[in-house]
Amino acid sequence: MAASPILECFQQEDLWFTAVVVTDGRGSPRKGLYAQYDDEQMRLVRFKEQRKAAVIGEYAALIMLDYPSKVIKDGRSQPPVEDLTAILTATQPKVVYTHNLADKHDTHVGVALKTIAAIRSLPTASRPAKLYGCEVWRDLDWMVDSDKVGFDLSPQENLQAALVGVFDSQISGGKRYDLASLARRRANATYFESHGVDTSTGLSFAMDMTPLIHSEDLQPLSFVEAFIQRFKQDVSDRVRRMS
C-alpha cells in the first residue's frame, strides 16, 4: 500500500518511514502449508512477516496495535483512535498514508476513519501536511484524472517484489498479492494516458484526503461521495458527447 514512501525513505539518512499495522491478522484466508493454522498461529506468523518486511524496507519503526477487526469496524470504539493519536504525537509525520475511503474492505475503511479522527484530535499546528488514501481492496483508476494522486513506482521493482513476497502466509495461503500488486502498478502506468506513451513502468494512485484533516466540518461520507459524483459526471458527459 505504501510502497512510494518506503522507496523514498530507503537508504536515506534524513527521511524515515514508520509502519503502523492496526489489526491482528487472525481472520485471513489460508490453505496449503497454513491450512491447519488456527487464528492465533496466523496472528503470530503475520507479525513475523511484518517484521521481515520492516527489515527489508529499512523502516524506522514498525508498530503493531494487535486489534481484532471487529474493534476497528466499531465506529464507537475509541482505543484505536487514542493509540493512533499517541503514535502521531510521538512521530510527528509530515505525510500519513492510510486506506482510501472507497476501499471495499470494511476494516480498511474503519482504519481510515480512525486515522482521520486521530489526526483531527491533534492541535492544528501538530497535524501532518498531507493525508493520502491508498489502493488495496479497490483500485482508484475509476477516479477522474484530476482527482488522482499518482506515485511513480518505476524504481527498485526488486525491492517492491521482496516487500510483498515476504507475506508467504497470504501468498502460499491462497492470495497472490505478489503478482496482483505489481501487476496493478504496471497496469496503472500503461492505462493512465490513452493518447501518450508510458512515462513510468509502475504507478500507484491515491485519494488526497488532506481536506478532511483541515476542516472538521467536512464529513468523510460527503467527501468520498464527491469523488464518485465527479466520476459519474465524467462518464455521463463522455457518453453524451459521443451520442
Predicted feature residues:
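Active-site rim/loop-helix segments in enzyme catalytic domains that contact anionic ligands
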Residues: 1-90, 121-124, 227, 232-242
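Metal-dependent de-N-acetylase/amidase catalytic core
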Residues: 74-243
